[in-house]
A protein has these predicted regions:
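Bacterial N-terminal signal peptides
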Residues: 8-17
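The feature marks proteins involved in alpha-glucan
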Residues: 15, 21-44, 49, 64-143, ...
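Surface-exposed beta-strand/loop patches in extracellular or lumenal glycoproteins
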Residues: 41, 45-48, 55-59, 526-542, ...
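Conserved, mostly hydrophobic/aromatic
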Residues: 47, 144, 169, 179, ...
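Conserved alpha/beta catalytic core and glycan-binding cleft of carbohydrate-active enzymes
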Residues: 108-119, 295, 311, 316-457, ...
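Substrate-binding/active-site clefts of carbohydrate-active enzymes
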Residues: 109-112, 128-136, 145-298, 303-333
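Hydrophobic faces of well-ordered beta-strands that scaffold small-molecule active sites
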Residues: 140-144, 177, 225-227, 299, ...
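Tight coil/turn sites that cap or link beta-strands
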Residues: 540, 581-586
Length: 652
């Protein structure tokens, strides 16, 4: 025997063959799961391919030679333990001699590349594990698109770059960020509603560790994270799940999808087959991954209508799937918030709330109507008081102002010729902030608070220069959000969904008055300013102004009509008071003023040409460490020169 020739051939055989295959893995889990136990270290590979004649795995750990998996005795799964495999190595399954990304792959190179073994246990969550769930009555949601939120040089922003703005979000006062879909999609830019890999996090946004760092940073700053999930359709492009194990019927998608007319959606024939237990479990496992591995605090389910209906025909399978997943959440993670985009309550499938599109369309029209005569105060009264916390109320979202839907931002729709002008600012500020005083859970879309008027697009970065140009508008949002969440400790009226009394509706003058607990709201939806408008207050005596959207501190062009914050009006013995109301403005009153030592101002960006000193005021309740972090973030974000000597002075 020629030993010199035999040894190289033997080495080549072992490299191609990889580790010896067990009959099947005795370890649990689907996909690629690193293990370190009494049996050693390595990775378990398991995939569902009931109709396949052969399944193998190949990757960097085999020199890209194929190693066969063993078909398990039940369930249509194939598995193997490979001691040579490690986290961070690329791999693919080989199903009937066809290379496939892992449908359960937790990380990918990209939507057309390889899967990557990922170890969830390697991430250090630190003290963020102590984060407490946000109570429903304390939720103020900020919808964010990770790719556009902090993008520069036409590159999509990563979750790490989004995390650089958490100090801003904390100062703004929001209590939750709702991320548009984060799963892998084709290319580097997308809204995210075309997922290709349902367990992997979009690589262009930084992948799984970057998302975890974002969630960790949010939790460390008291902000919850919700995730938008898409299960009404997948893809339709870059879907390695398509005809995954070789079986399909009628040219449809095989085991993961319906294989008849029920597969058809507006986005392709890629509706998951909710009638299969394995597909329902696949979806539930994704939700479980987000909660237990990424520590997310809630979900918004996209287009629930197209889960519960197929081409307009009722689909009980979809309702069964939603009930299964939501019931699992209720029993295992009851604090995780469950929101549907639509049709949450056609029957009980376990959702707590849904997006209120009627609020959007009705309230938005108050701003966009061509004349004051078209603004209906009865509609406003209804929208402010109905529904409670089972609805998420908003005036802008990705759908309402995005390029894919050929929509525009509210300021543009108000005045397309001058979206940065007086009328656009007045009406947009008034109408956008009505969500913050309603009985529902308010949501703001990224940029609304800085009067962004460019159409939302995954190709258009949010213009952070607007936080300087429209610093007063940002401050108006912050003031109202802090009032909503009772940050000053003087009133929790806006946290009670059942205390709404719209007691004054004047359709002729376009003025509405509302009582919520100990608060009085006066809302003027007309271009007419009033100097002595009579409004009934809950009781006589002195009432303090907590908010006035017409103040020139919010915009120098505003009318400055009515009292400043802390100013007073006096209700007479009949509990009526004459109010000075600016055009398209809102005022809020209470008999309990904002404590002087608890008031806060919010400068959202360094002013142009700032001098030798800049004052940053923060909430004393946040504590000195939070204040120091805020100062540090301001200095770092704005790259102030000569800011090495920062002096902080505490008062109150």
């Amino acid at each position: 025997m020629n030993i010199r020739r035999a040894f190289p051939l033997l080495s080549l055989f072992l490299l191609l063959r990889g580790d010896p295959a067990e009959a099947q893995s005795t370890r649990s889990g689907m996909g690629a799961i690193p293990y370190a136990d009494a049996g050693g270290t390595g990775v378990t590979f398991r995939t569902w391919a009931p109709n396949a004649s052969s399944v193998a795995v190949k990757g960097q750990f085999t020199g890209w030679g194929s190693t066969a998996l063993t078909k398990e005795s039940s369930g249509g799964t194939w598995s193997i333990d490979l001691a040579s495999a490690r986290a961070g190595q690329e791999y693919k399954f080989v199903v009937n001699a066809s290379d496939r990304r892992d449908p359960r792959g937790q990380r990918v190179v990209n939507s057309a590349g390889n899967s990557i073994v990922y170890d969830h246990g390697s991430f250090d969550w630190g003290s963020s594990t102590n984060f407490s769930a946000i109570w429903r009555n304390d939720l103020v949601i900020y919808e964010m698109h990770a790719g556009s939120y902090n993008a520069e040089d036409w590159l999509p922003s990563t979750f790490d770059e989004c995390a650089d703005k958490i100090a801003y979000l904390k100062a703004l006062g929001v209590s939750a960020v709702e991320l548009m879909p984060v799963n892998e999609f084709p290319g580097d830019r997308s809204w995210g509603y075309n997922p290709s890999d349902l367990f992997a996090i979009e690589a262009s946004h930084g992948g799984p560790d970057a998302l975890k760092r974002f969630v960790k940073a949010c939790h460390e700053n008291g902000i919850a994270v919700l995730v938008d999930v898409v299960h009404n359709h997948y893809g339709p492009s870059d879907l390695d799940m398509w005809q995954y194990d070789g079986w399909s019927s009628g040219g449809f998608g095989g085991i993961h999808f319906y294989n008849d007319w029920k597969a058809n959606t507006d986005w392709g024939a890629t509706r998951p087959d909710y009638g299969r237990a394995e597909v329902r479990d696949f979806i539930q496992a994704q939700i479980q991954m987000f909660v237990e591995d990424y520590h997310v605090d809630g979900f918004r389910w996209d287009s629930v209508y197209n889960i519960r209906n197929c081409s307009g025909t009722w689909n009980q399978n979809g309702s069964d799937m939603l009930w299964q997943v939501n019931d699992w959440l209720k029993n295992n993670h009851p604090d995780v918030y469950r929101i549907a985009e639509d049709h949450a309550f056609d029957t009980d499938v376990g959702f707590e709330a849904q997006w209120d599109h009627d609020f959007l369309s009705n309230i938005r029209y108050l701003a966009t109507a061509g004349s004051d005569a078209d603004r209906n105060m009865d509609t406003l009264a209804y929208c402010l008081g109905s529904g409670g916390f089972n609805r998420v109320v908003y005036v802008e979202s990705h759908d309402s102002c995005g390029d894919l839907n050929k929509k525009h931002r509210l300021p543009y729709d108000v005045d397309s010729g001058n979206p940065e002008g007086y009328w656009a600012k007045k009406r947009a500020l008034l109408v956008n902030t009505l969500a913050l005083i309603s009985s529902g859970i308010p949501m703001i879309f990224e940029g609304s608070e800085m009067h962004e008027w460019y159409t939302f697009s995954n190709n258009q970065a949010l213009r952070w220069s607007l936080t300087n140009e429209n610093a007063g508008i940002v401050r108006a949002y912050a003031d109202l959000i802090h009032l909503r969440r009772n940050a000053y400790g003087n009133t929790d009226a806006l946290k009670d969904p059942g205390n709404v009394d719209v007691h004054h509706v004047n359709n002729a003058a376009k003025v509405v008055g509302m009582k919520r607990g100990d608060l009085l709201f006066a809302i003027n939806c007309s271009a007419t300013a009033f100097t002595g408008y009579s409004m009934a207050f809950p009781s006589s005596g002195t009432w303090y102004c907590l908010y006035n959207s017409d103040l020139q501190s919010y915009d120098s062009a505003f009318g400055n009509i009515g009292p400043a914050i802390g100013g007073t009006v006096v209700a007479d013995g009949s509990a009526n008071a004459p109010l000075a109301l600016g055009a398209y403005s809102m005022q809020i009153y209470s008999q309990t003023p904002i404590p002087e030592d608890s008031s806060a101002s919010f400068d959202p960006a360094a002013p142009d040409g700032c001098g030798s000193s800049v004052t940053i005021t923060y909430m004393p309740g946040d504590g000195p460490l939070a204040a120091a972090a805020t100062v540090y973030a301001y200095v770092g974000r704005n790259d102030w020169q000569g800011a090495s000597n920062v002096q902080m002075t505490a008062s109150g």
